[in-house]
Regions:
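A short helix->loop->beta-strand "cap" motif at the edges of active sites that frequently abuts
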Residues: 117, 174, 323-327
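Hydrophobic/aromatic ligand-binding patch that stacks against planar heteroaromatic rings
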Residues: 29, 110-111, 168, 268, ...
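Internal gly/pro-rich beta-alpha loop/helix module
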Residues: 129-242
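Cysteine-nucleophile active-site neighborhood
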Residues: 301-375
Length: 451
């Protein structure tokens, strides 16, 4: 299958160079200009897509080259961008940074190569002059086919930009697409797992509008659209997704404590026949009525542990449901909620042991999970790509999967049973379609108990 898909990948020289700010400014400026736009994010990050979603009013896809083969990457990109004039893809870390310090595997560069996407590189030009060209020269010559077609200078001044832009275009033949000056009043705060979430930024819309207004003055949006239109059509074989079966209702925990979900994973569950019913473990007294399954995603339960403990009725409702066999997927923060306690605050108590602050990132990064037993989602020996990203650990993290990092380091993790997956690893259902199908089928088996 071949699909036209104008697209543009906003990459950075390094983490902290301003690519999220620049991406958000461009997205908001395009929306304000009436351009139909889609958004995507390289890698497994949950938070940046939340900002994209707030701006464009639609989901943002994750394009992760560790999770997906070429066909799936291109399918998700084409599906998300259908009917749009352009898809703006935000990179992750530095352009060439991948797994480990000496590899570009799973990097933004790999996404650009595998999706044949033209790249605009964001360089931090604060306090720099000719050195900006030296940095750009390195990025252009590090890889023969780097796909870099344009440059945006972040932190640049209106006085410096014309000279630097002219030098960039004359020396390298790369389009200078504009700059964004320093705007400290529009900065996005960070915490231990990256940016704070979009829902926690009180004046997010105002900040995005200020960024967009400046971008409309200083960034050549038409040049970006021209670069996006130069992208070749996407060629791929779409995944074989079964037709939707009998309708089921799956409760999805969605509030400030539980907000880490891949929107394409949720959409896949819908395509398979699931109605997703949102609820809040923070605010609601009990689970919604007539659920056939439960999805507890990740997030920041440790920041809301006192409030989660105080909602004893919800904790009891979830414990009773899981213990009676309601099919349940609980990832990272959702897994923590099912344990006895978080930092001494009582949780649902379905699983033994408590969670504690490890004081550092624990088992951070990509891993391949291999099921050690048959369970609701996986047959013994089956694998799925996953990632862990947390500073908290558990006394009993489970042992029903073998997790192995690309470096070869391995450990046992997660709980798996006939109606349960619970563990620190996050995964994307498009990384193993069978897991999504089995989850929905398990929910259908639960349905007769409610009739």
């Amino acid at each position: 299958m071949q699909k036209a898909a104008p697209r543009l990948l906003i990459a950075g020289t390094n983490s902290g160079c301003g690519k999220t700010t620049v991406t958000c400014a461009i997205l908001q400026a395009l929306v304000n200009a009436g351009v139909p736009v889609a958004a995507a994010k390289c890698g497994p990050d949950y938070i940046d897509p939340m900002f994209h979603r707030e701006i464009i009013g639609a989901k943002s896809s994750n394009l992760d080259p560790f999770f997906f083969d070429d066909d799936t990457l291109r399918f998700l990109l084409a599906q998300n961008g259908a009917g749009k004039d352009v898809t703006v893809i935000e990179g992750v870390m530095g352009y060439y940074d991948g797994i480990g310090l000496d590899s570009s595997r799973a990097s933004t560069f790999e996404v650009a190569q595998r999706t044949e996407s033209p790249v605009v590189l964001v360089l931090n030009a604060k306090g720099a002059g000719l050195s900006v060209l030296a940095v750009l020269d390195g990025f252009l010559h590090f890889a023969t086919e780097n796909r870099i077609r344009g440059v945006i200078l972040n932190g640049c001044t209106a006085m410096s930009y014309p000279t630097l832009a002219r030098a960039i275009e004359e020396r390298f033949g790369v389009r200078a697409c504009g700059f964004l000056p320093q705007m400290p009043d529009c900065s996005l705060e960070s915490r231990h797992l990256g940016l704070i979430t979009a829902a926690e930024v009180d004046d997010l819309k105002e900040k995005m509008q200020r960024l967009a207004a400046k971008a409309q003055e200083t960034i050549d949006l038409n040049a970006l659209l021209q670069i996006a239109k130069s992208a070749p059509p996407l060629t791929f074989t779409p995944p074989d997704i079964p037709a939707a079966g009998e309708h089921v209702r799956i409760g999805v925990a969605r509030d400030r404590a539980f907000c880490f979900y891949y929107e394409d994973s949720l959409e896949l569950l819908r395509r398979l026949g699931a109605e997703l019913v949102p609820f809040s473990p923070l605010s609601d007294e009990r689970l919604p009525e007539d659920l056939h399954g439960l999805y507890l995603g990740g997030g920041y339960p440790e920041l809301y542990a006192e409030r989660l403990e105080a909602n004893a009725a919800m904790r009891a409702s979830i414990r009773a449901a899981v213990e009676r066999g309601l099919p349940c997927v609980a990832e990272c923060g959702g897994f923590m909620y099912l344990t006895q306690s978080i930092a001494g605050h009582a949780m649902a108590g379905v699983l033994s042991g408590s969670c504690f602050d490890a004081g550092k990132l624990t088992r951070f990064g990509y891993a391949t999970l291999t099921a050690q037993r048959d369970s609701m989602l996986f047959a013994a020996g089956e694998q799925i790509s996953a990632h862990e990203f947390h500073r908290w650990d558990a006394e009993n993290p489970g042992e029903d999967f073998l997790a192995e990092k690309p470096s070869g380091r391995s450990w046992r993790c997660a709980y798996a049973g006939e109606t349960l997956y619970a563990g620190y690893p996050h995964f994307h259902f498009y990384a193993n379609l069978s897991a999504a199908v089995r989850f929905v089928e398990a929910c259908r088996k639960e349905k007769p108990r409610h009739e």
